[in-house]
Design a protein with these regions (language model features):
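Cys/His-coordinated zinc-binding microdomains
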Residues: 21, 55-58
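Polybasic, low-complexity binding patches
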Residues: 41-48, 59-97
Length: 97
């Protein structure tokens, strides 16, 4: 991993879960979620196309709570991956195409 990617992922994690913050649940430790929108079945998105999610909103929360338990319902509940990516990029002051 490049140093710039490592720094970016550290800054992402330091934000805390974007969903918890949007729901006024306070700061929660974040894992890195590489967005799936526009990716092939077994491809991982570039590190710059990642959002910070707590373990509940990332993988453990169940249907409608965790993105990996049902992305379409999760996006109806919390916003699309691309909307949240745009928010994160604005907060970090970075903009990637």
């Amino acid at each position: 991993m490049k140093k710039a990617d490592s720094l970016h992922l550290s800054r992402l994690a330091a934000l805390g879960c974007i969903v918890c913050r949007n729901q006024n649940l306070g700061e929660t430790p974040a894992e890195i979620h590489h967005i799936r929108t526009g990716q092939g079945a077994s491809q991982r998105a570039d590190h710059r196309k990642s959002i910070p999610l707590c373990h509940m909103h990332h993988r453990n929360g169940g249907y409608g709570v965790a993105i990996h338990a049902g992305r379409k319902q999760w996006e109806r509940n919390f916003g699309t991956e691309l909307q949240l990516l745009e928010q994160v990029q604005l907060e970090l002051g970075v903009f990637y195409a």
